[in-house]
């Protein structure tokens, strides 16, 4: 049913309803549903330090990797069911109802509220909907810079939130909570699968796990990278307009899909032209990739990469390209990079890896084609299970997102 407003504008109906409910939703001032409180800590580390983000509530250590910075005496104490609103990023959707922690403390920069007169579970679901983002955004005005907006609190408290009867609130909350819990379980499954995948990859390429019968096992061979790879230096003319960048999850992807704006130069005629099946080494480091990352181009017939990348093609007569792909997903190649990269030889997060040294790094790999194929098949199956779990998560998130759009006004 389409949204329909009554003549006085105080009653509306959502697009999607549970059977048996037809009465209109009634307007309630937001300020009548929330009641601000400020219960402060009196000593250091009185409770666990929490942070509210657009994605939800987190332990401070989950977001920042450390526990203490400045003094946390005088921080705001919260409990399960507390609404936490960011005073700086509310217009971006940094609004949460804490349903993850029994108690904790947050920075005084947040506003904290008790919820009354409606289902806390319903508000916890609504607050992550597009309708809620619009609701909060409409109570902000342009700030001192283009990226800042000021919250007009009186405007926010006076805005109307349309709510159904309590039985319908509970129906909606139960459904969306069920989906939220399923999403969380799926995320935990993906985390576990990722950890398992990494462990198996390390076990295989360190030879702790062999995938052929003992009687058929042959010694692995040490190769220089140049023994099984050829450097690619062909330049892009006008063959492609796809600027490639490396994504940890998807490998080499179109930069325009990865960033909100172009990072590469609009003129890519001097870039390397990479063809499908070829590899690129990005020497930029991160927590997940302390020695940079090596990925194979799989999504496009060709693309252009910055000349800061080291590119190469695999000699298939020596090493299976799929084997090389999985090998570079392990950390077994890090040692070779570490040996040629001087301690502290980083320039703004870019490793100082010489080209000749890179192609002279040594790698231990199976020389038997049958064992190479066995490794490829085994690791490919693990990857397929991991990707299937990711697709399942995306499907559930899409379902929940669609319901959020249609169940709320």
Which stretches of residues belong to each language-model region?
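A short glycine-rich beta-alpha junction/loop motif
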Residues: 10-14, 88, 104-109, 143-167, ...
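Sequence-specific dsDNA recognition surfaces
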Residues: 31-42, 46-80, 106, 226-236, ...
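Short, solvent-exposed linear patches
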Residues: 168-171, 373-374
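Short, surface-exposed secondary-structure boundary micro-motifs
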Residues: 89, 175-177, 285, 378-380
